[in-house]
Amino acid sequence: MYVQRNREYRGKHAMERLAPVDFSNMDRNYYDIAEEAIRWFRRVRKEGRGWQVFPEPSVPELWPNAKNSQSYPWDHAKAEIVERYKDITRLWQVGFKERQLAHEQSIYTWDDATLTPEIMGITGEKKALTLKKIIEVNRESNTDFVLPPIIDNNRGGWQQKSALEFFVDFETVNTIDDDFSTFPQPGGEELIFMVGCGYESPDGDWDFKVFTADELSVSEETRIIEEWFQHMREVSDRVLNERSALPKIFHWSYAELNFMKSAQRNREEAAGGATLPEWPELPWFDFLKVMRAEPVVVKGAFGFGLKAIAKNLYKHGLIDTSWEDGPVDGLGAMVGAWYCNRQVAETGQSMRDMDYMQEIEAYNEVDCKVMWELVNYLRENHT
């Protein structure tokens, strides 16, 4: 969508969504950006051979930006540099501009005793407090692995353990895998292809079930979601009693809710207007909101991502589960699903039977299980 002369333009396919590039007005800065890029390219070719990263950057441009995810194939090298520099962009919601303000005050590391959110231009009370807590827990002088010692936030009564709670994570694909066979109409589909669901059984053990699509399709997405609904209903009837309300469904961030909305749209569009049974309203509980609201901070974690939090709890011996080293992460799971789906077309085999998909299932279970262990750890030690 764009607006020109107070008129709004919208489009559904690629040719309808073209927008003008106005070099005489709002887009005139692209000339300067292009010239700057050319100058940088020439400078690197001429001078770059003599630049050094360690012990400190020989030119300002070599300071890494931990928030920039477009670093392939240099991701690991950049991570090492960020770690050794104790770079300020490693901090939660701190980027290039905030670091520049700190550098202007001759502050170059996140553990500098004089670094404050205000120096970085961060004045919002809540954001500033959160940053101070992250810096505090990560200082070498601090011996606590988790702060605060006692968590006040009891949103949704989470501190009181219920007889049954579900811990859920989705694996999904987006529309990037578009072969352009339908161009200019968009191709690819945003789908849930795996639902992992775990809970603590009455005897205290972890119980987990995963629902995986046979192929990437709306019908398979609908099938695994409805099987997951049925599974939660059966477990609730067995552990609680028949016709009891579903218990809390713990998840991490708003992603699951957004993908459920997308799955509902996919289902309705596939039905072509036919009447469908209503999907149940689910008692979602986003534990990330609890972590941010308090805030709960962990030594070694510089933000609130589930992996950063859980890996460092595991490192400190506070939970028992973590991810094994391997090719699977969120992006790897997505690419793996596309690969497996192509194998379905070639072999007629279900994605569920493929080795790579089984690795993704194992990865998904860890996502769910570390949430369970994390919540239990905080209940037992910080409430």
Go through each PLM region and give its residues.
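Conserved RNase H-like, two-metal-ion catalytic cores of nucleic-acid enzymes
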Residues: 142-241, 267-269
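Generic, well-ordered alpha-helical scaffold segments in large soluble proteins
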Residues: 101, 105, 116, 171-174, ...
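Short, well-ordered loop/turn elements at secondary-structure boundaries
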Residues: 96, 104, 159-163, 191, ...
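Charged, flexible boundary elements
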Residues: 121-157
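Acidic, Mg2+-coordinating catalytic module of metal-dependent nucleases/exonucleases
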Residues: 4-90, 96-99, 105, 309-383
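Conserved DEDDh/DEDDy metal-dependent 3′-5′ exonuclease domain
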Residues: 1-37, 208-335
